[in-house]
């Protein structure tokens, strides 16, 4: 199979937004207009193509990032008449599935940020925007739902500037809002676009309506000033009053969008089929191709030397696995982005994280959950492979004779856990295997065994996250399970630096055991996890025993010294030690490492940490006092408030332990009229009284 379009004609984009901003409907319309669909699906009737899991069809929300590909020939602009390939990832907007957004942004070259014209910039819009900033992803903004009562394009543009700190530049302004939304004014061409009342594929180009001419001129000047500010040649022409051509405006807009100094803003109503084709033109016109993004940086797995891979078919193959999924028909699917080279079905790749060589059985071009077999993939492509057994999310796969490790993905630790057991004893093994498969797919889902009770615990990013995974157990793996009440995933850390000697000696006939280590433990910045430094000099501990010390420390960190919770953000340095030529072993040093760490942690001012959530409540004004009083009673700290879309909003930081059952309480205190969103913010020290109560609980449990 030859390359269908040149690399500079490829766009890898994501569609990202707050829940219910219309992402899936917009993607459906894109697929319809690009010829991938012959009938449009609607989210509200469960017929949307991109929402392919049973739970997504029932709930009307997108949980996994479905990937698809389509082709588009722009009608206007510098790229008009040229066929382009657009690979699209439709990402979830619910905060419990932030990991899906994170991993798709990692492999994309651009994004369409959707905003609801009524709700404006909502909490999850901010979260997703920050994630896109982290990866430097160029964006265009599409203000959707212009047909809804209360729609306000200009308020949304203002909110993008104020709440997201971005530089939004409208390229269109709406003709009518709400029920009378008919189309828009194209500010580059200064023409009106009025849609016909069919499927939206036809429209009339008209002169700008008389009552909008002054406003259109004002916004065009605003656009020209914005593009002139980022280009000296254009600025000179603008100041001299010379005419600036349409081609010049588009070229400078493209450069500024790729640098994320300007966010082009468009408007439409995907549901009413208005604006989507012009948004596709903008995707091609302003978002990056793999050529614009340039070389990807990595390092050699053995020498650690930096390695760069150009986005060219002639380069050695390098790709990044960004998602694992289980398909009922073909088994394990590994979604990957090709950064360089060509990969053929049936060939071998090296996984540089495991050092193992694996064979690519088949390569599939995914269209939501449908698929077609293809012979090979080229630089810039996104596809799915069948046959990779040990590849995990974030692993690099590459040409075995030219190894490279691309930058890994970092995922947040789970904040909530529940006990789970099968309804029937016969399903015990099946439950274990099914949970392992789900954990392989989702890096923020963890499975562990409580050492004291023997219970299986599952941990995730929120109640909905775990609820859907338990639901998948039943639907996909035919395992029915009972689950306990949600528990907070507490953590522990230390506040002081301490040195401590860990010694393990056993003499009881036969071969003895001996290991002695001197450890220094010190606190790390929040979010840094764990760091182990080997500072041994002069061979006082043989090299082969040092990994065992590290393993012993990590084993001890799983059960902290305050209340038995995992410890985090700690640096451990192995300073000194002793060994015995006959009695020393890996096991002895592992135990010595564990003893040394526990002893040091007890003296290093250990503290208990709890997850703090960023909570935003949107409520009618008459319930504002009740909402604020209730948040304060939950140990919440009010951080700000304001007005949006005719309602009041309150931003606060609240411990997760105080938020269980909040949706029911909020519903009853506001007669169902308020809603809220919540996302993990950070870990913070638990108040002393609560920490002491949890310690007592642990002591009494140990005595039982």
Curated annotation (Swiss-Prot):
SMART domains listed in its UniProt record: EFG_C, EFG_IV
Function: Catalyzes the GTP-dependent ribosomal translocation step during translation elongation. During this step, the ribosome changes from the pre-translocational (PRE) to the post-translocational (POST) state as the newly formed A-site-bound peptidyl-tRNA and P-site-bound deacylated tRNA move to the P and E sites, respectively. Catalyzes the coordinated movement of the two tRNA molecules, the mRNA and conformational changes in the ribosome.
Entry's Gene Ontology molecular function annotations: GTP binding; GTPase activity; translation elongation factor activity
Keywords: Cytoplasm, Elongation factor, GTP-binding, Nucleotide-binding, Protein biosynthesis
InterPro entries, alphabetized: EFG_II, EFG_III, EFG_III/V, EFG_IV, EFG_V, EFG_V-like, EFTu-like_2, G_TR_CS
Membrane-spanning ranges: none
Places the protein is found: Cytoplasm
UniProt cross-references to Gene3D superfamilies, sorted A to Z: 3.30.230.10, 3.30.70.240, Elongation Factor G (Translational Gtpase), domain 3, P-loop containing nucleotide triphosphate hydrolases, Translation factors
Residues in coiled coil: none
Binding site for GTP: 17-24, 90-94, 144-147
NCBIfam families cross-referenced by the UniProt entry: EF-G, PRK12740.1-3, PRK12740.1-5, small_GTP
A GO cellular component annotation in the UniProt record: cytoplasm
Entry keyword annotation includes GTP-binding: yes
Protein name: Elongation factor G
CDD domains: EF-G (cd01886), EFG_III (cd16262), EFG_mtEFG1_IV (cd01434), EFG_mtEFG_C (cd03713), EFG_mtEFG_II (cd04088)
GO biological process: ribosome disassembly
Domain tr-type G span(s) in chain numbering: 8-291
Family: Belongs to the TRAFAC class translation factor GTPase superfamily. Classic translation factor GTPase family. EF-G/EF-2 subfamily.
């Amino acid at each position: 199979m030859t390359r269908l379009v040149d690399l500079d004609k490829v766009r890898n984009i994501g569609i990202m937004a707050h829940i219910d901003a219309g992402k899936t409907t917009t993607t459906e319309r894109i697929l319809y207009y690009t010829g991938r669909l012959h009938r449009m699906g609607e989210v509200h009737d469960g017929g949307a193509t991109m929402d392919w899991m049973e739970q997504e069809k029932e709930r009307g929300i997108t949980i996994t990032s479905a990937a698809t590909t389509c082709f588009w020939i722009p009608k206007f602009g510098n790229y008009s008449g040229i066929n382009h390939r657009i690979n699209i990832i439709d990402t979830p907007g619910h905060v419990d599935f932030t990991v899906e957004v994170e991993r798709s942004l990692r492999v994309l070259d651009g994004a369409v940020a959707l905003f609801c014209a009524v709700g404006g910039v909502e909490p999850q819009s901010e979260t997703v925007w920050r994630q896109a900033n982290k990866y430097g992803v160029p964006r265009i903004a599409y203000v959707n739902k212009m047909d809804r009562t209360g729609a306000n394009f200009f308020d949304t543009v203002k909110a993008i500037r104020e709440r997201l700190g971005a530089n939004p530049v409208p390229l269109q302004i709406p003709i009518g809002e709400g029920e009378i939304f008919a189309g828009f004014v194209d500010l580059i061409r200064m023409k009106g676009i009025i849609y016909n009342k069919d499927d939206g594929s036809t429209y009339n180009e008209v002169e700008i309506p008389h009552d909008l001419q002054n406003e259109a001129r004002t916004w065009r000047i605003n656009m020209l000033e914005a593009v002139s500010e980022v280009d000296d040649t254009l600025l000179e022409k603008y100041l001299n009053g010379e005419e600036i051509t349409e081609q010049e405006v588009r070229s400078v807009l493209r450069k500024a969008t790729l640098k994320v100094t300007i966010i082009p803003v468009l408007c439409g109503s995907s549901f009413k089929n208005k604006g989507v084709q012009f948004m596709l033109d903008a995707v091609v016109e302003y978002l990056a191709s793999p050529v614009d993004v340039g070389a990807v940086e990595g390092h050699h797995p053995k020498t650690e030397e930096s390695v760069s891979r150009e986005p060219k078919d002639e380069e050695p193959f390098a790709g990044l696995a960004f998602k694992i999924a289980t398909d009922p028909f073909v088994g394990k699917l590994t979604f990957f982005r090709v950064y360089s080279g060509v990969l053929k079905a049936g060939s071998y790749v090296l996984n540089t994280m495991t050092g193992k060589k694996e064979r690519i059985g088949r390569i599939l071009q995914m269209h939501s959950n449908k698929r077609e077999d293809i012979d090979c993939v080229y630089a810039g492509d996104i596809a799915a492979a069948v046959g990779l057994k040990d590849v995990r999310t974030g692993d690099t796969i590459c040409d075995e004779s030219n190894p490279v490790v691309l930058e890994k993905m970092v995922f947040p630790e789970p904040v909530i856990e529940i006990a789970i057991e099968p309804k029937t004893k016969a399903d015990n093994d099946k439950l274990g295997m099914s949970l392992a498969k789900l954990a392989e797919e989702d890096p923020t889902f963890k499975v562990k065994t409580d050492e004291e009770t023997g219970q299986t615990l599952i941990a995730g990013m929120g109640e909905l996250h775990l609820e859907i995974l338990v639901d998948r157990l039943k639907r996909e793996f035919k395992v029915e399970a009972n689950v306990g009440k949600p528990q907070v995933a507490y953590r522990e850390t230390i506040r002081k630096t301490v040195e401590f000697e860990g010694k393990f000696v056993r003499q009881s006939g036969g071969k003895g055991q001996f290991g002695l280590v001197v450890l220094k433990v010190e606190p790390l910045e929040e979010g840094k996890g764990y760091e182990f430094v080997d500072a041994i000099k002069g061979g006082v501990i043989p090299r082969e025993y040092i990994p065992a010390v590290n393993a012993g420390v990590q084993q001890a960190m799983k059960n902290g010294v305050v209340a038995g919770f995992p410890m985090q953000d700690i640096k451990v340095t192995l300073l000194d030690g002793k060994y015995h030529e006959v009695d020393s072993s890996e096991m002895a040093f592992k135990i010595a490492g564990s003893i040394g760490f526990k002893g040091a942690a007890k003296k290093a001012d250990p503290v208990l940490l709890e997850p703090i959530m960023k909570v935003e409540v949107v409520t009618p004004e008459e319930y504002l006092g009740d909402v604020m009083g209730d948040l304060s009673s939950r140990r919440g700290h009010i951080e700000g408030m304001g007005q949006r879309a005719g309602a009041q909003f309150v931003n606060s930081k609240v411990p997760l332990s105080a938020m269980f059952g909040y949706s029911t309480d909020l519903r009853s205190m506001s007669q169902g009229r308020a809603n809220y969103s919540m996302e993990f913010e950070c870990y913070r020290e638990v108040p002393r009284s609560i920490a002491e109560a949890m310690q007592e609980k642990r002591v009494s449990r140990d005595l039982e």
